[in-house]
């Protein structure tokens, strides 16, 4: 009995045309040209299911997916009208005939067997029925006899109709992507060195290439090659656009451009060369380089890398080298970007290094780097540890801080710069942060910390864990008062510098404190209390009234004589430890 029920259930199931799985009748949709299940319709989208069905129909015909005695679902009524399965070569000939480009000189639209959504092809021609195949075969064979060539897939001849394994799967789709050579219009695809011979018929362009290809003259090809990135040959698709010889020639030209000597720059006397003149020369030489291979370097980069390089370049060096870097010619020659103020010997070598390392995309009229709040933000990349050290624009520093110093001695230094050779993105974020502040030059060596809180607000339990700097954020206070800059007021620091030099201890019981679990007085940085002492102090002062600092003093708020007091929520949080323990024991 159970076997009979199973047979009846299996007989009621309908096979989906796309996923070829047996489905129950309530899971099938009959609104399209073939019966498809609801899962396929939801996955593909109701507006694209017809295109997918047409693609699947062509694939099944081309590859002979149906064994003997089995026909595609729903094809019993039209089985007599459909011819036997066709090969991919026949489909190519039929498409040539239908598009009206049956001549041997025209480049046909290649049947991309692995493309999933033939949007352009399906939108330009009506769906082909079985009778179309039968009527078009003799004409196609007369117009162009079949050749034993394998079918072109994405413009590359492969023996079995499948694309190469090393190509990413997005090359098999018709959606535009940067690897399809979209920078060159389809009607202006040349053999990149100006060859006037058209592409052979077998090399059909895989994407949405037009049927007619115009050969471009040598000047047009050269202008296209210099203005657009030649990433067509770099992504293993040389057969569809250019020959291997053309690619080699392009590489030789690019190498020649990089090796040619720089244009001679006008130099005045060494004693009259000022900082602005040196900056103008550096900017002009960088702009001249960017018109060569620099543009291609910038264009070939991803968008985020281009934005980062642009932002970092705009904050370039505009001041003279300091004494430390003058004493170390190894740093000056190859690793640092900039120039010397006397301009006698080191300027050309360093400017050439800067031109190779940092192509400038800004317009030529711009002289020197833009300034933030009247001060330039130079970044000196030291390529040893990836640490970015800003040259301090004030003349009071004899030398910039060494790489071993904390990166927080200057506000213009990224706070994450000393960690693992931080990427330029963090530096870029901090540059944007400094650009938004109106007092970046005043507190140039104030500790830049996201944990700084408003001193007028009473402490809260949510911010209790944020009232002390991390170990890496405190070391900069030692270098804070150097060079005659404005010293940091101690009250603006959320913690004392004892956090790294000595272990944290409770002010009352002198027991060691946990890293993130203690009570910090917002007025006196040295007042730190463990939770048991804080609870005892709150109970002694009376939790119902005003509860002041657990040290017994009425520590005033910064900038006023009013002593701070705990909020009721903070008192409840501190006292909640005992209650929670009792509840856990009771349960």
Curated annotation (Swiss-Prot):
Disulfide bonds: none
GO biological process: immature B cell differentiation; negative regulation of transcription by RNA polymerase II; regulation of transcription by RNA polymerase II
Compositional bias (Basic and acidic residues): 247-260, 292-306
Positions of post-translational Phosphoserine modification: 71, 175, 240, 318, 360, 406, 423, 455, 457, 460
TM ranges: none
Crosslink feature (Glycyl lysine isopeptide (Lys-Gly) (interchain with G-Cter in SUMO2)) location: 289, 303, 324, 326, 348
Motif (Nuclear localization signal): 354-361
Zinc fingers (RING-type) by residue: 506-553
Record field: compositional bias (Low complexity): 272-287
InterPro entries associated with the record: I2BP1/2_C3HC4-RING_sf, Interferon_reg_fac2-bd1_2_Znf
Region Disordered, annotated ranges: 126-192, 225-306, 342-420, 437-494
GO cellular component: cytoplasm; nucleoplasm; nucleus
Cell compartments where the protein resides: Cytoplasm; Nucleus
Assembly and binders: Interacts with IRF2. Part of a corepressor complex containing IRF2 and IRF2BP1. Interacts with VGLL4.
Entry function: Acts as a transcriptional corepressor in a IRF2-dependent manner; this repression is not mediated by histone deacetylase activities. Represses the NFAT1-dependent transactivation of NFAT-responsive promoters. Acts as a coactivator of VEGFA expression in cardiac and skeletal muscles. Plays a role in immature B-cell differentiation.
Protein name per UniProt: Interferon regulatory factor 2-binding protein 2
Source species taxonomy: Eukaryota, Metazoa, Chordata, Craniata, Vertebrata
């Amino acid at each position: 009995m159970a076997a009979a029920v199973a047979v009846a259930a299996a007989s009621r199931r309908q096979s989906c045309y796309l996923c070829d799985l047996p489905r129950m009748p309530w899971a099938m949709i009959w609104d399209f040209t073939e019966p498809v299940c609801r899962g396929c319709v939801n996955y593909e989208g109701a507006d694209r299911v017809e295109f997918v069905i047409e693609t699947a129909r062509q694939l099944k015909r081309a590859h002979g997916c149906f064994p003997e005695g089995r026909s595609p679902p729903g094809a019993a009524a039209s089985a007599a009208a459909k011819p036997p399965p066709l090969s991919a070569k026949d489909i190519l000939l039929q498409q040539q005939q239908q598009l009206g480009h049956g001549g041997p000189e025209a480049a046909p639209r290649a049947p991309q067997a692995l493309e999933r959504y033939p949007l352009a092809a399906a939108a330009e021609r009506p769906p082909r029925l079985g009778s179309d195949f039968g009527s078009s075969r003799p004409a196609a064979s007369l117009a162009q006899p079949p050749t034993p060539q394998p079918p072109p897939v994405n413009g590359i001849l492969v023996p079995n109709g499948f694309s190469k394994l090393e190509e990413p799967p997005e090359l098999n789709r018709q959606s535009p992507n940067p690897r399809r050579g979209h920078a060159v219009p389809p009607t202006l695809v040349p053999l990149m060195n100006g060859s006037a011979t058209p592409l052979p018929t077998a090399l059909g362009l895989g994407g949405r290439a037009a049927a007619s290809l115009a050969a471009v003259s040598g000047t047009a090809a050269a202008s296209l090659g210099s203005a657009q990135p030649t990433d067509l040959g770099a992504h293993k698709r040389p057969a569809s656009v250019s020959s291997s010889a053309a690619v080699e020639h392009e590489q030789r030209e690019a190498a020649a451009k990089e090796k040619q000597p720089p244009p001679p720059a006008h130099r005045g006397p060494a004693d009259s060369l000022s900082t602005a003149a040196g900056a103008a020369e550096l900017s002009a030489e960088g702009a001249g380089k960017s018109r060569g291979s620099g543009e291609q370097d910038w264009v070939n980069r991803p968008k985020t890398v281009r934005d980062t390089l642009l932002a970092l370049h705009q904050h370039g060096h505009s001041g003279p080298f300091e004494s430390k870097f003058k004493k170390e010619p190894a740093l000056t020659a190859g690793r640092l970007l900039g120039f010397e103020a006397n301009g006698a010997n080191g300027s050309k070598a360093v400017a050439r290094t800067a031109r190779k390392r940092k192509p400038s995309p800004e317009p030529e009229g711009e002289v020197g780097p833009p300034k933030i709040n009247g001060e330039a933000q130079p970044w000196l990349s030291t390529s040893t540890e990836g640490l970015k050290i800003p040259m301090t624009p004030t003349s009071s520093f004899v030398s910039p801080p060494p790489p071993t110093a904390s990166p927080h001695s200057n506000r213009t230094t990224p706070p994450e710069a000393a960690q693992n050779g931080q990427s330029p993105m963090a530096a870029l974020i901090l540059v944007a942060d400094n650009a938004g502040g109106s007092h970046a030059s005043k507190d140039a060596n104030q500790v830049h910390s996201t944990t700084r809180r408003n001193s007028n607000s009473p402490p809260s339990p949510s911010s209790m864990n944020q009232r002390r700097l991390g170990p890496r954020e405190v070391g900069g206070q030692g270098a804070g008062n150097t060079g005659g800059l404005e010293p940091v007021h101690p009250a603006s620091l959320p913690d004392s510098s004892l956090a790294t030099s000595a272990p944290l201890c409770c002010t009352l019981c002198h027991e060691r404190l946990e890293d993130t679990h203690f009570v910090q007085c917002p007025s006196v940085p040295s007042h730190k209390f463990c939770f048991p002492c804080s609870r005892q102090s709150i109970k002694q002062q009376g939790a119902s009234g005003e509860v002041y600092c657990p040290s017994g003093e009425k520590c005033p708020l910064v900038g006023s004589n009013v002593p701070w007091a705990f909020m009721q929520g903070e008192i409840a949080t501190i006292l909640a430890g005992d209650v929670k323990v009792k509840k856990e024991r009771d349960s």
